[in-house]
């Protein structure tokens, strides 16, 4: 890991592409910033209405909670083939810097002029290997959307958003800790995994894999 704090003053927002071809913020927990050469991504865990829009339920407490999870599991799982190289952690400013390569899979999949099969022929095998690698090492990876993956410069599939990593032996969490970041799209998975205010994230993962 490098030892200086990166200056992001001239970095640009990174926006994901959605299924209806709209560019929007890539995450509700952090501001995604891409350097001019598009090979480093800064994940700035903060409340930024300019990037994310108004989020009345989001609090700094929730942001900090997920920042700590991001750092913990990125560091803990650097040995996995699918984990992007961690370049720097700027704790005072809640920033994480990782290797990057221009765009996520969402940019390819949701662009009718592009084909993931043509650009990345073995994507299915690599995706299977990502899920298997987490399983074999004793973890669930809950966020598996197209915008959570990118292809690095070596042609390897990498996955981001390590705040959504859950150990096999520690998969319960109180809903009140994360309620402010539960969106409408996948809220049923939280609802169906909750008992007495506690969410079973193992069940959440199974719903993600089998239904969502």
Question: What is each PLM-predicted segment?
Answer:
Residues 40, 82, 96, 158-161:
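Protein kinase-like catalytic core scaffold
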Residues 1-21:
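Juxta-kinase regulatory segment immediately upstream of eukaryotic protein kinase catalytic domains
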Residues 135-152:
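Catalytic-loop of the protein kinase fold
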Residues 63-66, 73-123:
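Conserved structural core of kinase catalytic domains
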Residues 14-75:
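ATP-binding glycine-rich loop module of kinase domains
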Residues 152-212:
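C-lobe/activation-segment region of protein kinase-like
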Residues 126-135:
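Short C-lobe core helix of eukaryotic-like protein kinase catalytic domains
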């Amino acid at each position: 890991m490098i030892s200086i704090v990166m200056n992001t003053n001239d970095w640009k927002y990174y926006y994901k592409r959605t299924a209806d071809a709209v560019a929007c913020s890539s995450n509700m927990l952090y501001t995604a910033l891409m350097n001019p050469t598009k090979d480093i991504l800064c994940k700035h865990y903060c409340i930024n209405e300019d990037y994310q829009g108004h989020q009345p339920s989001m609090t700094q407490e929730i942001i900090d909670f997920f920042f700590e999870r991001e750092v913990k599991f990125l560091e803990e799982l650097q040995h996995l083939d699918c984990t992007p190289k961690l370049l720097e952690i700027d704790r005072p400013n809640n920033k994480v810097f990782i290797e990057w390569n221009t765009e996520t899979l969402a940019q390819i999949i949701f662009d009718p002029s592009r084909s993931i099969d043509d650009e990345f022929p073995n994507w299915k095998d690599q995706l299977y290997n990502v899920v298997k690698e987490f399983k074999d090492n004793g973890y669930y990876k809950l966020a598996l959307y197209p915008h959570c993956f990118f292809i690095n410069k070596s042609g390897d599939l990498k996955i981001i958003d390590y705040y959504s990593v859950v150990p096999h032996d520690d998969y319960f969490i109180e809903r009140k800790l994360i309620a402010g970041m539960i969106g409408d799209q996948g809220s049923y998975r939280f609802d169906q995994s909750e008992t007495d205010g506690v969410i079973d994230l193992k069940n959440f993962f199974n719903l993600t894999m089998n239904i969502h």
